[in-house]
Amino acid sequence: PACRISQMGQAGRYMTEYRELRKTYGILDIIKTPELAREVTMQPINAFDLDAAIIFADILPPLEGMGLDLEFIKGEGPVLHNPVRSLADVERLATPDPKEALWFTLDAIKLTRETLDPLGIPLIGFSGAPFTLAAYAVEGGGSKNHDKVKSMMMGEPDAWHQFMTKLSDVVGQYMLAQAEAGAQVLQLFDSWVGQLAPDDYRERVMPYSKRALEIASEAGVPMIHFGTNTNGMLEDIRDAGGDVIGVDWRIDIDVAAKRLGNSVAVQGNLDPVALFAPWQELEPRAKTVLDRMQGRHGHIFNLGHGILPQTPVDNVKRLCEFVHEYTSK
């Protein structure tokens, strides 16, 4: 059978249709209007030969539901105006019911399923993982060194434990609610976990990712667990949970697959920047990923992280077609 392909962040700024919509609406407006979220989710499905849709959402609204003031600032990205810096800050945080705090994404999932079902294309729901959400919440936005969040993790164990416990509940319940709303696959994104030493991951992060995935697993749908820069802790990511482990481009995918063993499928791992290259450069890179996984049970072809804003649409189209043609021979 042809290899399955989906692409992280497959809806978004590289598509003209999305840029048109953004002239009128801010990103949070789109996410919080289920009809618009469905429209954006469907844009790549209508344009490319993809095997799955990914709900158009963002990892940060769960933090808003907990009481943080989120704003997307043009040119800066997300900013949280009241970051979490102390035990008192942690204690103030709510653990909201996702059906109330995140109703818009759940409604978007229901609506999108109505459109996708006749096409026979499944819908993927997702959430940020506890550590990645903590990183945004403590830093107050994106960060180069993640010194504030790591300082809390190392220096304030009580605050850290309480915070990560709250986050794991929120994330687990949110993923569960997405599956109940109709998501047929769930993905946990731990985008910043590669900033950690493996020991710190094992002792101070992994138990909470595991807890979130255990809560979500009650839904009985396949789960993808993805982090970037995880070569130092691949086996730990696997042991935290997930049926599919996503890997980035910084490791040969066959090496990652060998380390992960046969209990999980593997997703990845083309460098997103390869999509900027001319086709004669892009094609052999895609071929290499597929050849390295040939004959292995369970591979989802994907990028090693999110698709970048200026990505040429023609290359995305050709890549989707190529993956299906090459693997169905």
Model feature map: region roles:
Residues L21-T24, L70-P96, H146-S151, I253:
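Glycine-/small-residue-rich beta-strand-loop submotif within the FAD-binding core of flavoenzymes
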Residues A2-G12, L50-L80, K99-K144:
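Glycine-rich, aromatic-flanked loop segments that form ligand/cofactor-binding clefts
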Residues A101-K329:
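Active-site loop segments of alpha/beta catalytic cores
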Residues M66, L70, L87, R296-G298:
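Flexible, glycine-rich active-site loops centered on histidine and acidic residues
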Residues P1-L68, F72-K74, D291, V313-K329:
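N-terminal basic, low-complexity leaders that serve as flexible interaction/assembly modules and, when applicable
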Residues T33, R85-S86, N145, P278:
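Intrinsic-disorder/low-complexity, polar/charged segments
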Residues R19-E20, T24-A37, D89-L106, K110, ...:
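Basic, amphipathic N-terminal segments that precede the first structured/catalytic domain
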